[in-house]
């Protein structure tokens, strides 16, 4: 999953910075994952801590629900922001670090064990961007 917050230096803040200057976005990635709001993760952790049994430790995965490509993620940021910028797919290989092509997490265990409904990434992104404005 791809974690973002209101702090700088994450995918959302980088896209917002580019569109604030009127730049178009070029995405060369074929990566798929689940964009995840750090606020949702923090709220989840605080809500499940009292429910944990300290004698039995489990490993849980969490991300906002739904899966998208980085291209789709950038498009959604632009749409919610009502920007005139465009997203273009760039097939050129990046010089940056190789990333996994599929990094979505299975959240069924945490959802079932703690009886939680996980917010969809689009809804959470909209909440996040509205909070920034």
Residue ranges and their predicted role:
Residues 1-33, 38-47:
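NAD(P)-dependent short-chain dehydrogenase/reductase
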């Amino acid at each position: 999953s791809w974690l973002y917050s209101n702090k700088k230096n994450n995918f959302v803040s980088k896209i917002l910075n580019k569109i604030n200057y009127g730049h178009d976005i070029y995405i060369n990635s074929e990566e798929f994952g689940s964009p995840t709001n750090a606020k949702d993760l923090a709220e989840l952790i605080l809500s499940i801590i009292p429910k944990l049994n300290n004698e039995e430790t489990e490993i849980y995965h969490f991300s906002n629900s739904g899966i998208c490509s980085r291209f789709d993620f950038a498009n959604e940021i632009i749409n919610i922001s009502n920007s005139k910028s465009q997203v273009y797919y760039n097939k050129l290989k990046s010089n940056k670090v190789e990333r996994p092509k599929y990094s979505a997490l299975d959240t069924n265990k945490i959802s079932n064990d703690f009886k939680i409904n996980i917010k969809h990434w689009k809804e959470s992104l909209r909440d996040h961007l509205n909070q920034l404005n």
